């Protein structure tokens, strides 16, 4: 991997943490991921995949809704 070993990678990680701060790293990673996804989508390299947020396309009915329909 470009001739980088563990000590060099740890040094790069330490510099990134010092520059951006540990609290901003998740936001930077999320922004980078969204940018890569939109770039792939623009070139047709990736289809839209469902997210794990729990917002499924099929709505579920609660038991109280089912009970009122039977009565």
UniProtKB/Swiss-Prot annotation:
Keywords: Cell inner membrane, Cell membrane, Membrane, Protein transport, Translocation, Transmembrane, Transmembrane helix, Transport
Annotated region described as Disordered, given as residue ranges: 43-71
Primary location recorded for the protein, binned into one broad class: membrane
Lineage summary: Bacteria, Pseudomonadati, Myxococcota, Myxococcia, Myxococcales
GO molecular function: protein transmembrane transporter activity
Compositional bias of kind Polar residues: 52-71
Record's subunit section: The Tat system comprises two distinct complexes: a TatABC complex, containing multiple copies of TatA, TatB and TatC subunits, and a separate TatA complex, containing only TatA subunits. Substrates initially bind to the TatABC complex, which probably triggers association of the separate TatA complex to form the active translocon.
Membrane topology: Single-pass membrane protein
Pfam families linked to this entry: TatA_B_E (PF02416)
Keyword NAD: no
Entry keyword annotation includes Cell inner membrane: yes
Gene source species: Anaeromyxobacter dehalogenans (strain 2CP-C)
GO cellular component, one term: TAT protein transport complex
One BP annotation, GO: protein transport by the Tat complex
Leader peptide range in chain numbering: none
Cellular compartments annotated: Cell inner membrane
Reported function: Part of the twin-arginine translocation (Tat) system that transports large folded proteins containing a characteristic twin-arginine motif in their signal peptide across membranes. TatA could form the protein-conducting channel of the Tat system.
Residue stretches spanning the membrane: 9-29
Entry coiled-coil feature ranges: none
Similarity section: Belongs to the TatA/E family.
Protein's UniProt name: Sec-independent protein translocase protein TatA
